[in-house]
Amino acid sequence: MSQSTLVIIGAGGIGEAIARRVGPGKEVLLGDWSNALLQEATQRMKRDGFRVTSQHVNISSHDSVIQFAEKAQSLGQVMHVVISAGLSPVSSTRETILAVNLAGTGFCIAEFGKLIGHGGTCVVISSLAGYTLAQDVPHGVIQHLARTSPSDVLGLPLLRETVLDQWSAYGVSKRVNYVQVQDASLSWARRGARINSISPGAIQTPMLSLESQASKEEVVHDLAQNVPCKRVGDSGEVAHVAAFLLGSESSFVTGTDILVDGGALAYLSRDTSS
């Protein structure tokens, strides 16, 4: 068995970047719902010398997540987990976004929390949208959604009343992720493990390209021109932060969210009254 296994759930731009940054010397398990994307990422990493295994996973299915976790455990002691699977409001419906980003993330946190090794770490990739698209939703509502079983949350009348379209579904699900991580940090700590989240802003990935093309290009351009860093980020910059959170240097950091947004939240929260 391999001494240390790195699990990447979501093999897209950010997921693969983290796998490459953290994966050397580890057994890497890649998972994604898209077989084509999964195969391409696996082949690229194998060509570059990584030890990679892949398996299809649909995180909106609890059974699929359980099977994926069993596969991870068969490869060796799971020490690092990255949950980067998620759907964009541009290409997905309200229902599918909630099933993946909200319930699916909950399934992953719960199942890998049962087998993570002592000293292990997890990073959930959330989004700046959790701060900007759900700011009007009462925190008590967010807490209730986060603390309802992933198997039951999609049927809550409160969810239907709160989330009216795919954009609010995206923002609410990402804000719920913060509370899911905070709550999980307590149970993970009992196993000697840590869990945190990262909220990227505008990062140059295929998902951002889709959002730019779907009548949101002016928003992305505005952010790139006006945020303090004056540009969009790249997936490697998110991977560097993930490496910190997954490593021993962050041993006193758990249950928190780190923004990697080039200062976008500061820009969006600025005082415009003067």
From Swiss-Prot:
UniProt binding sites for NADP(+): I14, Y170, K174, I203, T205
Active site residues of this protein: Y170 (proton donor), K174 (lowers pka of active site tyr)
Pfam name, any one: adh_short
Pathway linked to the protein: Mycotoxin biosynthesis
EC number: 1.-.-.-
First-level EC class: oxidoreductase
Keyword Aminoacyl-tRNA synthetase: no
Gene3D superfamilies cross-referenced by the UniProt entry: NAD(P)-binding Rossmann-like Domain
Molecular function (Gene Ontology), one example: oxidoreductase activity
Family matches, as InterPro entries: NAD(P)-bd_dom_sf, SDR_fam
CDD domains, per the entry: SDR_c (cd05233)
Keywords tagged on the record: NADP, Oxidoreductase
Similarity comment text for this entry: Belongs to the short-chain dehydrogenases/reductases (SDR) family.
Role summary: Short-chain dehydrogenase/reductase; part of the gene cluster that mediates the biosynthesis of the diterpene glucoside brassicicene C. In the first step of the brassicicene C biosynthesis, the bifunctional diterpene synthase bsc8 that possesses both prenyl transferase and terpene cyclase activity, converts isopentenyl diphosphate and dimethylallyl diphosphate into geranylgeranyl diphosphate (GGDP) that is further converted into fusicocca-2,10(14)-diene, the first precursor for brassicicene C.
Protein name: Short-chain dehydrogenase/reductase bsc3
Organism expressing this protein natively: Alternaria brassicicola (Dark leaf spot agent)
